UniProtKB/Swiss-Prot annotation:
The keyword Zinc applies. The gene is queC. Catalyzes the ATP-dependent conversion of 7-carboxy-7-deazaguanine (CDG) to 7-cyano-7-deazaguanine (preQ(0)). It catalyses: 7-carboxy-7-deazaguanine + NH4(+) + ATP = 7-cyano-7-deazaguanine + ADP + phosphate + H2O + H(+). This is 7-cyano-7-deazaguanine synthase. ATP binds at residues 8-18. It is an enzyme of class 6 (ligase). Binds 1 zinc ion per subunit. One of its GO terms (biological process) is queuosine biosynthetic process. GO terms for molecular function: ATP binding; ligase activity, forming carbon-nitrogen bonds; zinc ion binding. PANTHER family: 7-CYANO-7-DEAZAGUANINE SYNTHASE.
Length: 232
C-alpha cells in the first residue's frame, strides 16, 4: 500500500498538500505539531479539516518544548507580529529549528507506519523570511533521515517552486479552492479564511488569490507546465 505522511498545520499550504496527497496515495496520515503556537485555534482547524477530508489517521504531537527554546512572535503572545526584518535578517515570526524538528518527527512516524513519503508545504517563496523552507535544506534533511534510519524515504515538496497564485491553482486543480479559501487558517492574527488582510501571511495569500482569480487560465497553464517539467 502506498502511504504518505503530510505535515499538516491547517493552513493554506499544508491543506493544499493534503488534498493533493489524498488524490495520489492509498493511505494518507496527517501529523500536526502543538508547539505552543500563538493561536490554539490552529490545532482545532487542523483537526476539523483532517476529519472532513477523511485522512487515515491524524496525529497531534506535543512539542511544546520548542516554545521554551525558540523565541518568536508565533510562540509568544507578548511579541507583536512585525512586517520588519530583525537585525539577523529574519522576521520575528521565524521559529528556529521548527522544520528541523517537524520533519524529524514526521520521519519517525513514517518509519513506524511503513510510509516512504513525507509531504510538507514549504516553498522557496518563503525563503526571504524562512531559511528552513529552502530546497537545499529539505534535501539535506531527507539525506539525514535516510542515513539515520537506514530506510528509503522521500520528502516531497509540491509547492517548492510555485508562487502563491500557482498554489491557489493547485488547490483548484484538486477541487479544493473553496475549502482552502474558507476553512484554512493562515493568518498570524488567528482569523480563519481570508484572515485579517494585514499580516505578512494574509498579504501574501490575498495577492496570490487575486492574481489567480484574475488570470486563472494562464496561471493554471503555468502550474501544469511546472508539473510536467518536474515529472521528467
Amino acid at each position: 500500500m502506498n502511504k504518505a505522511v503530510v505535515v499538516f498545520s491547517g493552513g493554506q499550504d499544508s491543506t493544499t498538500c493534503l488534498v493533493k496527497a489524498l488524490n495520489e496515495f492509498d493511505e494518507v496520515h496527517a501529523i500536526t505539531f502543538d508547539y505552543g503556537q500563538r493561536h490554539r485555534l490552529e490545532i482545532e482547524v487542523a483537526q476539523n479539516l483532517a476529519k472532513e477530508l477523511g485522512v487515515a489517521a491524524h496525529k497531534v504531537m506535543d512539542v511544546t518544548l520548542l516554545n521554551e527554546l525558540a523565541i518568536s512572535s508565533l510562540t509568544r503572545d507578548d511579541i507583536p507580529v512585525s512586517h520588519e526584518l530583525q537585525e539577523n535578517g529574519l522576521p520575528n515570526s521565524f521559529v528556529p529549528g521548527r522544520n528541523i524538528l517537524f520533519l524529524t518527527l514526521a520521519g519517525i512516524y513514517a518509519y513506524q507506519i511503513g510510509a516512504e513519503t513525507i509531504i510538507t508545504g514549504v516553498c522557496e517563496t518563503d525563503f526571504s523570511g524562512y531559511p528552513d523552507c529552502r530546497d537545499d535544506f529539505v534535501k539535506a534533511m531527507n539525506s539525514a533521515l535516510v542515513k539515520g534510519m537506514d530506510k528509503p524515504l522521500v520528502i516531497q515538496t509540491p509547492l517548492m517552486w510555485l508562487n502563491k497564485a500557482e498554489t491557489w491553482a493547485l488547490a483548484d486543480q484538486n477541487n479544493a479552492l473553496q475549502l482552502v479559501r474558507e476553512k484554512t487558517l493562515t493568518c498570524y492574527n488567528g482569523i480563519v479564511g481570508d484572515g485579517c488582510g494585514d499580516c505578512p501571511s494574509c498579504h501574501l495569500r490575498k495577492v496570490g488569490l487575486n492574481d489567480y482569480l484574475d488570470n486563472r487560465e494562464a496561471i493554471m497553464a503555468s502550474l501544469v507546465e511546472k508539473q510536467h517539467a518536474e515529472s521528467k
